[in-house]
Amino acid sequence: MILFPSVDELLKHIDSRYSLVMLASKRANELDAGAAPLLEHYDSSKSVGKALEEILAGKVTIDPDHTEDLQD
C-alpha cells in the first residue's frame, strides 16, 4: 500500500486509477532501464515510488494523442 503520494492526490493529475497504474508502471520500467530522473530528490527508493512522485510533481503526464500506448 502506498502512503505517499496519496492516491487521491495522484488522481487530481490523472483521470482514472487504471491510467495511473499504467503510467506509473511504464515510467518505472523506464527508470529501471536507465532513464534520467526528472526530480532532484525522491522520498522513495523504489522505481514505482519515484514514478508516482514524478506524476504528482506534474513531470510525467499522459499525452492525449497517445493514450492507446497505455494499453500495450
UniProtKB/Swiss-Prot annotation:
GO annotation, cellular component aspect: DNA-directed RNA polymerase complex
Gene3D superfamilies linked to this entry: 3.90.940.10
Gene Ontology molecular function: any one: DNA-directed RNA polymerase activity
GO BP field: DNA-templated transcription
Cited InterPro entries: DNA-dir_RNA_pol_omega, Pol_omega/Rpo6/RPB6, RPB6/omega-like_sf
Keywords associated with the record: DNA-directed RNA polymerase, Nucleotidyltransferase, Transcription, Transferase
Catalytically driven reaction(s): RNA(n) + a ribonucleoside 5'-triphosphate = RNA(n+1) + diphosphate
Quaternary assembly: The RNAP catalytic core consists of 2 alpha, 1 beta, 1 beta' and 1 omega subunit. When a sigma factor is associated with the core the holoenzyme is formed, which can initiate transcription.
Role, per record: Promotes RNA polymerase assembly. Latches the N- and C-terminal regions of the beta' subunit thereby facilitating its interaction with the beta and alpha subunits.
Assigned protein family: Belongs to the RNA polymerase subunit omega family.
PANTHER family: DNA-DIRECTED RNA POLYMERASE SUBUNIT OMEGA (PTHR34476:SF1)
Name under which the protein is recorded: DNA-directed RNA polymerase subunit omega
